[in-house]
Every structure is written in structure tokens, then in C-alpha cells.
Amino acid sequence: MYSYIRGVLTEKNEDGVVVDCHGLGFDLQMGPQLAARLGEIGTELTVYTHFHITQDSQKLYAFPDKESRKLFRMLISVSGIGPKVAMSVLEDFEPAEFALHVLKKDTKALTKVKGLGKKSAEQIGRAHV
């Protein structure tokens, strides 16, 4: 639906950020570690997005780069991993670092992510490596 949003960072909160794009404020889901990479309030920026629809909600997730969005999409394609766990992965690891742990089958490092158990970590390796 939306590939990216370019605008001005107007707010950071516990759930994400708000980006003003020509007078329209987009409420974007993003963890605090990722949000910190965006800069200060008032910064002009581009964020890459993923629109996620469930039976109960519609949320627009934002990422500072395409690689983070790609990892998020890969993770939510794995059975049992939802957006919350995928965002936790992105809070704890850079995409390249996470990929290295998956390639090494380093489940000890992967299971340090909140909500990611051994079974899910192994499933990621089987599904996408």
C-alpha cells in the first residue's frame, strides 16, 4: 500500500513516531531503538513502511531502511512470529547481524530476543536460509 513516507519527524512516543507529510500526520509503529536512528524532532526524513492488517487492527510499521523492512517481512512470514516479535528482533539486532546468527544456527543469541523461543529461532533458519 505505502512503500515509504517522506516528511518531517514531529513526535516520538513509546509506540513509535509521527511523521508529517504535507499536513497529514502518519502514526507509525516503531521501536525506540529504531526511532533513535531517525534523528531529532523536526528532522526531514524518509521511512520505509509495511501496512499490516489483522482481524482486530490496522497498523503502519516504519523502518529507517529497506533492509530492516525486508527482515521484518521475512520474519512475519514465519509461522508463529508476528509483528511484535519481529520488531523486537529489529530492536536487538541489525539485519546483517541477525542473518549471521541465523546462518550460524546460533539459537542462544536469537532466543535473547523477547518473545523468540528456540522453536521459532530454528524455524526461521529452516524457512529462510
Where would I find each of the regions flagged by the language model?
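Structure-specific DNA junction-binding interface
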Residues: 1-77
